């Protein structure tokens, strides 16, 4: 570890999002380039830095700074440079020169102890003198606070966020109740706050620790997809987390309820406990669905006549259920169309589109992610977009407390201007997104919800499609007939067999459904590599990158993490000149296939021409979005990913925790996607995870070919296993309450 002391000569580059800075340091030995995370660093400041020398392939020797301390300037020139650097608002180079000329080495003492004397300098009023003193004091306090926070292992960026939020009260908050951080600062959860509390010496049975632990337990259940927990389950989980007796936790439920942080609701299964936000999301969603569910007067005979005319003109043939679906869409404010692969959902949607266009009605179409929206566009010939783009995301819906805004430009105050909205892949839509969508729709708009209710539920909380069907308050048309063209696909035929719980013949006589029996995990991986690199690209006329490995689990010998590490080395090996970046347990390279693993509404994307001209830009990259790494810049510490529609995003290295390799992904993450070929490694696993719906979802992701490699007994057991993990939701009940 090297220690160097000198003045900040020039700031070459600064990333305002994460504080990453490149600057020239001037000391007795000359100039030195320093790189690292520095918050509020200004030219002219005297700093003592600790770090290690590295050699950059382009920029030469640099000092990578691990920690630093800002010192008071020690000579007149440095004091003048610091004051005139822009660090103090209103003080330029010439005014700084006059201040130092007047007070010389005594400058900082005058500013701190006798600030009124600054008015003796030409160009400084008494008011300005006070403002300069306040700014200098604030910067001094901020630096002390940063050093204090970093003692607790808090990163520079998080420390800056904490100080920006609390200011001089930072010490008081941390020493009084550090659990406030978990509630008020994004990026700090209960566990970090708990570590700080332990270091400070706060007792494990303190009131605010228990209250924060209860709330954290509920938040974790939301991450699992639940909207509530029963009291008994909540208390057991919180007790295990806090290592505190249940009897010492239960009494806090009423306190949290009185503070409106949670909602307690009696039910047949016992007392339900909700995070207040999600309780009211369900309630508001149910009410808005009820308000949209209007009936429109139009005679069936008139609708039927128009449908038959459309069939003739568009050269399509609808069966009875498909005609019923079109009629339900015309006559109702909300209708639900569901069915498995090959049952004619797309044909039915096209018939609806033709019908509404014949009535000169405007239609908007959307799906939860970009891949599903693109498939919708290809299937219908009409533009579809993501729900987030439809609603014009302009903030963070997860932080926006105003229910009329929801972090979107399209909301109750600025609703969508259309007659019909068709949403596909509804099984992927979670409660917050459904609420945001409904907030932007006015009664009188027809809402058509399309999906496969046998797919896995959304990654986020809720089970929207199933709850809407279970409420029995909306017209539902379930398509079951497999059309002749689809019958030629064993992917479709076997998917329906799996859904019905029927055994599937694994004789490998199919043209698009194969099962390769293997028992050894390493042999299975070897087969995967052969399939992806040599066999399948030619068979389905696709690139190896287009072939997707889907696996049930994240961990284990055939889990996402291990498979990605192996697949990366074979599909995108290191090469001289190919940039790469290590981050935690991951290593990213240019050319890697990656996935965003959390919603980030603040990430900016842009679409540019080959000449660098920006033709479109926006905000928001979402959980499950997949792209390719196109650039890694170690100088600016950014990694660029190109997503669908050629949207490019620059990630500061600090945000790489939001990305992971995507050569292999979990089946759950594949929802709404379709790939030319899917390869599924399959050995034994936990019964609660290895169930029928998981297998059904995986198989229906393939367009041309499914290959399963592994244990055929596990495959047949999954078909028989209907023990899908149930989610605690109450939307169906809320809807029925409004429907009467």
Which residue stretches match the model-derived regions?
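Conserved lysine of the Walker
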Residues: 345
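Hydrophobic positions on the alpha1 helix immediately C-terminal to the Walker A/P-loop
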Residues: 348, 352
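Conserved helicase motor core of SF1/SF2 NTP-dependent helicases
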Residues: 355, 359-361, 370-377, 388-395, ...
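Pre-Walker A (Motif I) flank of P-loop NTPase domains
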Residues: 331-337
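C-terminal accessory regions
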Residues: 500, 616, 623-740
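N-terminal pre-P-loop "Q-motif" helix
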Residues: 315-331
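Accessory, non-ATPase domains that flank or precede helicase/AAA+ motor cores in DNA-metabolism machines
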Residues: 1-305
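Conserved helicase motor core of P-loop NTPases
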Residues: 453-619, 738
């Amino acid at each position: 570890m090297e220690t160097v002391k000198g003045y900040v000569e020039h700031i070459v580059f600064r990333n305002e999002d994460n504080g990453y800075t490149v600057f020239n340091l001037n000391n007795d030995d000359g100039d030195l380039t320093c790189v690292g995370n520095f918050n509020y660093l200004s030219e002219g400041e005297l700093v003592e830095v600790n770090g290690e020398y590295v050699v950059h392939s382009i920029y030469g020797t640099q000092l990578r700074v691990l920690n630093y301390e800002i010192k008071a300037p020690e000579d007149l020139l440095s004091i003048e440079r610091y004051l005139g650097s822009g660090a103090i608002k209103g003080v330029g180079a010439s005014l700084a020169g006059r201040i130092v000329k007047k007070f010389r080495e005594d400058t900082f003492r005058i500013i701190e102890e006798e600030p009124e004397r600054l008015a003796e300098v030409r160009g400084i009023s008494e008011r300005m003198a006070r403002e300069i003193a306040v700014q200098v004091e604030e910067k001094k306090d901020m630096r002390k606070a940063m050093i204090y926070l970093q003692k607790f292992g808090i990163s520079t960026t998080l420390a800056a966020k904490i100080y920006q939020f609390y200011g001089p009260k930072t010490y008081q908050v941390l020493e009084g109740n550090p659990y406030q951080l978990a509630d008020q600062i994004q990026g700090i959860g209960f566990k970090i706050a708990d570590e700080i509390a332990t270091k400070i010496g706060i007792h494990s049975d303190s009131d605010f620790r228990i209250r924060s632990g209860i709330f954290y337990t509920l938040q974790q259940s939301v991450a699992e997809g639940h909207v509530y927990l029963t009291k008994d389950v909540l208390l057991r989980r919180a007790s295990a987390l806090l290592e505190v007796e249940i009897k010492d936790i239960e009494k806090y439920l009423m306190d949290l309820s009185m503070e409106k942080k949670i909602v307690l609701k009696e039910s047949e299964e016992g007392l339900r406990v909700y995070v207040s936000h999600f309780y009211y999301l369900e309630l508001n969603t149910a009410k808005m669905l009820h308000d949209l569910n209007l009936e429109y007067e139009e005679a069936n005979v008139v609708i039927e006549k128009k449908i038959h005319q459309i069939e003739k003109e568009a050269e399509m043939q609808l069966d009875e259920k498909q005609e019923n679906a079109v009629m339900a869409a015309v006559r109702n404010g909300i209708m639900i169309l569901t069915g498995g692969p090959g049952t004619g959902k797309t044909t039915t949607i096209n018939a609806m589109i033709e019908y509404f266009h014949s009535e000169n009605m405007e239609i908007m179409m959307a799906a939860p992610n970009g891949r599903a929206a693109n498939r919708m566009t290809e299937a219908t010939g009409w533009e579809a977009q993501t729900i987030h783009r439809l609603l014009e995301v302009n903030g963070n819906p997860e932080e926006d407390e105003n229910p009329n805004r929801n972090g979107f430009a399209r909301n109750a105050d600025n609703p969508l201007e259309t007659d019909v909205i068709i949403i596909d892949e509804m099984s992927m839509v979670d409660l917050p997104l459904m609420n945001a969508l409904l907030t932007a729709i006015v009664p009188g708009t027809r809402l058509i919800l399309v999906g496969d209710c046998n797919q896995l539920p959304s990654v986020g909380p809720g089970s929207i499609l199933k709850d809407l069907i279970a409420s029995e308050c909306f017209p539902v048309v379930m398509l079951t007939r497999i059309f002749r063209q689809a019958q030629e696909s064993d992917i479709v035929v076997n998917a329906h067999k799996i859904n019905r719980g029927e055994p599937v013949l694994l004789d490998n006589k199919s043209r698009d459904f194969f099962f390769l029996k293997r028992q050894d995990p390493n042999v299975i991986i070897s087969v995967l590599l052969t399939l992806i690199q040599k066999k399948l690209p030619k068979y389905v006329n696709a690139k190896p990158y287009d072939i997707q490995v889907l696996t049930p689990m994240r961990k284990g010998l055939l889990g996402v993490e291990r498979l990605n590490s192996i697949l990366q080395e074979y599909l995108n090996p290191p090469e001289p000149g190919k940039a790469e970046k290590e981050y935690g347990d991951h290593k990213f390279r240019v050319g890697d296939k990656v996935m965003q693993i959390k919603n980030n509404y603040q990430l900016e994307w842009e679409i540019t021409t080959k000449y660098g001209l920006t033709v479109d830009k926006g905000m928001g990259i979402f959980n499950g979005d997949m792209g390719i790494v196109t650039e890694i810049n170690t100088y600016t510490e950014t990694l660029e990913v190109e997503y669908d529609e050629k949207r490019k995003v620059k990630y500061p290295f600090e945000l790489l925790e939001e990305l992971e390799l995507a050569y292999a992904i979990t089946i759950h993450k594949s929802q709404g996607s379709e790939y030319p070929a899917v390869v599924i490694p399959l050995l034994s696993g936990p019964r609660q995870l290895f169930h029928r719906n998981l297998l059904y979802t995986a198989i229906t992701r393939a367009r041309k070919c499914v290959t399963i490699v592994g244990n055929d007994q596990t495959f047949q057991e999954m078909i028989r296993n209907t023990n899908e993990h149930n989610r605690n939701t109450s939307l169906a009940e809320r809807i029925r309450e409004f429907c009467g």
